[in-house]
Structures are given as C-alpha cells and as structure tokens.
Amino acid sequence: MSAISIETKKVTELTAFTTPTDSCLIPIHDGTGLKKITFANFRAKAVEGTEAKIAPLLFNNAGAHNAIYRGKSLGSTVTTAQYAAIKAGTFDDLYIGDYWTIGGVNYRIAAFDYYLNSGDTSCTTHHVVIVPDTCLYNAQMHNTSSGGYEGGAANTTAGGYVGSDMYKSNLEQAKTTIKSAFSGHVLKHRIYLTNAVANGRASGGAWCDSEVDLMCEQMVYGSGIFSPVSDGSNVPANYRVEKSQLPLFQHEPSRICNRATWWLRDVITASDFARVGGYGDAGYDYASHSIGVRPAFCIS
C-alpha cells in the first residue's frame, strides 16, 4: 500500500520541523485558494515595520542609550573599546545600569552625555556619568574635633557646598580612589555650585571645575524636595546645570536607596544639608553628622 499523501494528513500528524531555511515553503490561504510562500518572504512580511519601530532604541547615541536599563556586569576594568565608544559618543554595548566592579566597588552607569553643552565653558566631550552602588566611606560636611556630631555652631552651612569641609577636603579620599580606578579618564567639566548662604537659603554661587562631587536633589529625585524655594519675594540662588533626574534612578528607583544614609550637596537650612536616608527617604541632616559619601563623576 502506498504512503499516505501529506495532503490527507492532519496537521497534528505531520513531522515537526524547527529549523526552516529561506527556501522552505509554507501553505497559505489568501481567501481565494491555497497558495505557497517561501519562509524568507513570510519572515520579511511578518517583521515589516518592526525594525523601524525599534530602531530608535538601538541607535548608537546618548539619547537611545539613556532610554534602556540593562544592568549588566562589564567586568573589572573599562576596556579600550569601551573608552573608544564613549569618546565617539556611540556608547556601543553600554547601557544604563551596566557596571564595572573595581576594588570591590560596583561603579554603575547613571547617564550618557548628561553634561554635554552645559557650563560657562561648554562641555563638548562625550562622557558617561558614574555613581557607585555603595558609599565609599563616611564623612562630615562640617568637621568637628571629635569627628562626629556636635551641637551648636558645629552645624553650619555657611559658605554653602563650596564652603564645606566636604568640598574642601573630605572628598579627597573619593577622588584618589576614583582616579585610580579610572586612571586618566575622569572628566573635568564645569558646574554651578553654592558658595554663600543667607537665612538658611542659598544666596550665591559660582562656576567651578568638577571631577568628583556630591549629587544634588535633582539628580537623585528629579526635583528639589527640601531645598528652599521662592516665597514670592525672596528667590534662593539654586542655580545648577543638573536639572533632571539621572536615568539610572529614573529607570530603577531602587538604586537610590543602598540601605545607608548619604549626603547630597543642597543647602536646606542654616545648619542642614540634604541627604538620602537609609530607609529610602528623602531628608536633611546636621552638617556635623558623619554619613555616607556617594559621589558622582564622569569618565570619557
């Protein structure tokens, strides 16, 4: 007896085939009768328009790469190819949340070209903003002889962030660690920082060189939380180039809280600077408290 023709078999009786080639034929009914189409043509028609829709997510530029959170380990060093991609502004195979583990610290990508075209001297260098997952150490905004909290005059925001001991000396350890981890690639750029305070509000500032600095509320939360605002008569000097939330914290808010309390640079009162709480809360703290140093910096 001859074999049963495929035309007389039920679909469930056919041999399974999982590796079709472009020349394979697929039966298809167009409403007038049964026709055939090659697998290559079927596939092309099925994805028609899809590539155009997803292309913006795959473009090699800062805008596209700022829009994708991946969170991949990139190893223990930035490769020559990765630095080349950063320099070119293509950021090939680098995405928000990706990180390098160097010296036991996860240095995580927080933004691409965040400072591009900003500053009194325009930043024209393509770059990646990096934020460590953990605090590098604890330090005070205003130093005391005891090295810890002291009441009274020890808690002052006079001189703003630029006038603080954090800015003047307590960030040096972080700068040394970071410059060792990313030797020759830490970008110096210009940002506007508070250097005067009146009645517990920022009253003056200046353009400053920045390599490694504390973040501000806008970078972490996307807006000011406790930073003083205009009361209709008095306008605090809250000038800054960091006007938007870092994509890292926008895409993955859990990265804000690392279960430690750490400093931000905003002046909140005559005695308090902003901070992120260990429970994930926004807050502020006396300047003499010794809490976490979790700075941001750029590599290029």
Predicted features by range, described:
Residues 2-49:
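Extracellular repetitive beta-rich solenoid segments
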Residues 52-300:
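Collagenous Gly-X-Y triple-helix signature in extracellular proteins
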